[in-house]
Amino acid sequence: MNLFPPNMKSIRILTVLVLSALSGAVARAHDKSAELDAGQKAFLAQYEKVRVALAADDLTAAKSAAAPLAKDLAEVAKEQTKAQSAADAAKKLTAATSLAEARGAFKAVSKRAVHYAQGQKGYYVANCPMVEGGEGDWVQTSTKISNPYFGKSMLTCGSIKE
């Protein structure tokens, strides 16, 4: 005994097909690694060097790694005004005289990194709830937390958001 008339069965099949197609599109939208251009990939690679240095409490290495970021972001900011705050922050990071100052500037640079990395394969957005203002997001290439905001004193504080 068929509970649905033939045309209802066709509608159900069509609905299942449409939903299947949509779920595949959503999954592909989350994995948009092919959409990163060479400049964005270079930015994220250099950003990772800054993050690792800050997690290790190495101000000299963080400042050194931030210099190419500052230069590249200044160029991007000429065409994209949204990049200006990250460019200014990267420049401040290169001139930082303390880890606290460098980490403060790193927050603004991290906003740009999160923008690029969200949904990208191989990049993880992490968060430390202890960062003032709840703005403790950063990007890393490993699922093992390595906190750049508190370094060695709270190296594993945080969690992967996405």
Give the predicted meaning of each segment.
Residues 1-2, 125:
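Generic N-terminal simple sequence motifs
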Residues 2-18:
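Bacterial N-terminal signal peptides that target proteins for export
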Residues 20-23, 27-162:
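Intrinsically disordered, low-complexity terminal tails/loops enriched in metal-binding residues
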